[in-house]
Amino acid sequence: MFSEHLAWSSHDGVYFNDLLPLPYNAETLDCVIRHIDEVQHTLNTRLLLENPSTYVSFGASDMDEVEFLRAIAGRTGCGLLLDVNNVYVSSVNHGFDAAAYIDRFPVELVGEIHLAGFAEDQDADAGRLLIDAHGAPVADAVWSLYRRTLARSGPIPTLIEWDNDVPDFAKVVAEVSLARVILVEEATRRNRRRAA
């Protein structure tokens, strides 16, 4: 299994040190589908496409991210990697409801979940800006969205990303332990609901 972000980082031979968002429209959809088909055919394996964290959006978008990801997966057969921290970061940065995003996300296509911590800054208008920095503990709001996801999906392999300002091992293990506890609790609740 391998994954890639729904993003771009180069143009005309110039490479950028970030993952940049795409306009969510038919033209971009066709381009992304061609690339995913090529990759999956060449490697003879299924790609998991990850939702990005975004800091800007395009006026040329005529569908939202969930619609766009669902359309890509439907036409390519790729799976999805749900980065719950990215959902929260983007929801704060763009003012959308993260819980509603999770409720619409096609969890039946998710092969892996990512959790991480974010950094907080200010945008040009002194508004709150979150950065997917992978350098802090998972925030309470992200844990809540993780619970919400698992309540719909059941257990899904989960990775905690922490590659900046890495703390001592015990703190990382505590984050992993909390993810396991939540995964088991939500699986138990889900099984009880099904049995009732």
Predicted regions and their residues:
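Generic structural signal for well-ordered alpha-helices
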Residues: 32-40, 66-73, 102, 143-150, ...
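Active-site beta-loop-alpha junctions enriched in small/polar residues
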Residues: 5-7, 52-54, 85-89, 115-120, ...
